[in-house]
Amino acid sequence: EYAEAASYYVACVQEFPLSEADDFDVPASFARAIEGPGDVAYICNPNNPTGRLVDPRVIDAAACRCEQVGALLVVDECFLGFAPDARERSVAARAACSRHVAVLSAFTKLYGMAGLRLGYLISGNAQLLEGIRRAGQAWPVSSVAEAAGIAALEDVEYVSRTRDVLAGERAWLSHELSSL
């Protein structure tokens, strides 16, 4: 989706295919491909569709490189809430005070609100945020989506219950697949 969107702006897209030989991990060379101002590097953490968490050192190296050369690192954390150590792995705090790091997330995955289209961006880059506001719709969040988001955040036990259920399901699925 992001590569397609970039093509509308005639952007040059450099992809980093993941391979089984490298355990489907984002390569350490990722940061070295970030060359200068105007570059936008995108990482999905955890990776979709593998579900593998990106090595924090790879994300840190990419963020540092973006800060050095004036580029932008966008980290999609829409699936990160499923990880038990999501708070420790998130780069949202760094993004909040950086002009060169942004975090995308949404209620779509963890809260199962795909049809409500409720998401957010965290960045300390006021120019980026203003540009997104100007490009957006007059009413970007419906009242139904807003109410659902507030209700989801008020259920403070939901995330831990969901993680517990998924841990059990993951173990069951792994067992069943290994018995094939």
Sequence positions of predicted segments:
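PLP-dependent aminotransferase-like
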Residues: 1-43
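Anion (oxyanion) recognition and catalysis
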Residues: 7, 67, 178
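Short, structured coil segments at secondary-structure junctions
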Residues: 9-10, 97, 180
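Active-site donor-binding loop signature of nucleotide-sugar glycosyltransferases
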Residues: 18-20, 45, 106, 134
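Active-site pre-lysine segment of PLP-dependent enzymes
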Residues: 24-37, 49-73, 77-110
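Structural motif
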Residues: 40-44, 74, 120-122
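PLP-dependent aminotransferase class I/II
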Residues: 100-179
